[in-house]
Each structure stands twice: as structure tokens, then as C-alpha cells.
């Protein structure tokens, strides 16, 4: 199971969802996946992807997660987080298939304040399964070497930045390794937008470490 918690997403997805509730509570919307590379996939890939998407329906906010978000995100009212504790991803609302050219199509249609929550988890799942099926292996030595160079540049020139890698991550394990390195050595990294990592590993407020 790739996405194991509702918090494995970017914080702005929650703020966007709340904005839709306040401004457009009855508006419907559609999230459409667009593969700019026009990658050709296999039926085995599609089967694995559908299995992961089915798993999304099992996700629930835990009491600990709810408490963490209400405490650290007071710019969103508690009633919103309590609503999220009853929210469930619905695989039946996700249309996923390969066309005749083996290109991947994904569409999710629902109320805007719900459909926006599907985007990041779906993209993270597609990315990780794609790397797995295409035999791509992360070279952690190379990743950490390049990351160290960027951290050194940031530290030297006081360049502030944030980590927003969830939707395009190679895998959840690679993202965690990168975030740990940033947390330990990047003086001007303001944090991660991934609520799960902010909650689970670093005892920092969502987004901000410093």
C-alpha cells in the first residue's frame, strides 16, 4: 500500500478544499490526469494501479492525526477537520483506463471540495508504480550527493525554499530520505508541505520547521 494515510498529501489541498466549501459548496468538478510524455502502459500496470486506488477507500483520519492538524493548522476551523474525519475516497468515482494506444486516462468527478483531495495521492501512486514497472531504481548516493550540493548553495546564499515533492516523488521512501536530509542540514528550508511527514517524523508544525 503506497498511500497509507489521508495526511500523505500537500497542505494546500486541505486549504483549497476548505475554500471550495466556503465559496462553491455545490460546484462539481473533474480532475483529469494528463501524461505529457504520452507513456505507453501495460494491462499489468493498470491492474496494479487499480489495486492501489481501491486501497484508498480504507484511509481514515486517526484521532492523533485529527488532533495534530487542528493544533497546527488553526487557520482552518476544527469543524473542517472533523468533516475530513468522515471523508472517504470513493474508487467508484475514479474512471481509469488505457486507450487503444495504451495511454493512461484518469478522471475523477465529484463536488469540488472533495475532488481536489484526490489529485496528489493519485499522482504519487502513478509515479511510484510507473517507476516500479519500468524497472527504475533510485540511486540514493547520487540523490543525496545532488541534494547536498543544493543544500550547500542554499545555506551559503541564504536561499529559502520548501519541499513540495509528494506528487512527483520517485517513491515514498525516497521522499522521506530527502526530507530527513533537509531537516538535518538545510538551514533555510522552511519545511515540507507533506502533512504526514511533518506529523510523523519531525515534531514540527505542518510546512514550517523554522
Residue ranges of model-derived segments:
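Ordered alpha/beta subdomains of enzyme catalytic regions
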Residues: 1-210
